[in-house]
């Protein structure tokens, strides 16, 4: 959402918002340890995305590359995307059988706001890997998938 003339708010349409996110994802983000892009360039609804997180330093995740799937339904960005790890990971907010990030256990999804982005989700998941309850959890063998 942005402010229009006279302080009125303007709601950016879903597809424009996703195009902005696609452009930002293609340019690269921050320090390069998180990235994302569309799965299928022909999907006019821009629903299916792939994210990548490189595990943070000084944790059991260090140097590991995690692949995720993000699915933006028609209600995005009013409602958060569904987020699922493709790479196996052991984290408190991730279902150990399906790889789905549980919105009830992951604050950003639980308290979703329209202004949040897929980049925010990936950055926050990386931060979550560094928290005291996740940083030392025994991890599945590298390269295994859900």
Curated annotation (Swiss-Prot):
Stated role: Has no ubiquitin ligase activity on its own. The heterodimer with UBC catalyzes the synthesis of non-canonical poly-ubiquitin chains that are linked through 'Lys-63'. This type of poly-ubiquitination does not lead to protein degradation by the proteasome. Mediates transcriptional activation of target genes. May play a role in the control of progress through the cell cycle and differentiation. Involved in the error-free DNA repair pathway and contributes to the survival of cells after DNA damage.
Pfam name, any one: UQ_con
Protein family per UniProt: Belongs to the ubiquitin-conjugating enzyme family.
Induction notes from the record: Not induced by stresses.
Identification of the protein by name: Ubiquitin-conjugating enzyme E2 variant 1D
Source species: Arabidopsis thaliana
InterPro entries linked: UBQ-conjugat_E2_core, UBQ-conjugating_enzyme/RWD
SMART domains named in the record: UBCc (SM00212)
Phenotype of null mutants: Plants do not display apparent morphological variations, but are sensitive to the DNA-damaging agent MMS.
Domain UBC core: 13-146
CDD domains: UEV_UBE2V (cd23807)
PROSITE patterns, A to Z: UBC_2 (PS50127)
Tissue: Expressed in roots, shoots, leaves, stems, flowers and pollen.
Protein's gene: UEV1D
SUPFAM superfamilies xrefs: UBC-like
Lineage: Eukaryota, Viridiplantae, Streptophyta, Embryophyta, Tracheophyta
Subunit structure: Heterodimer with UBC35 or UBC36.
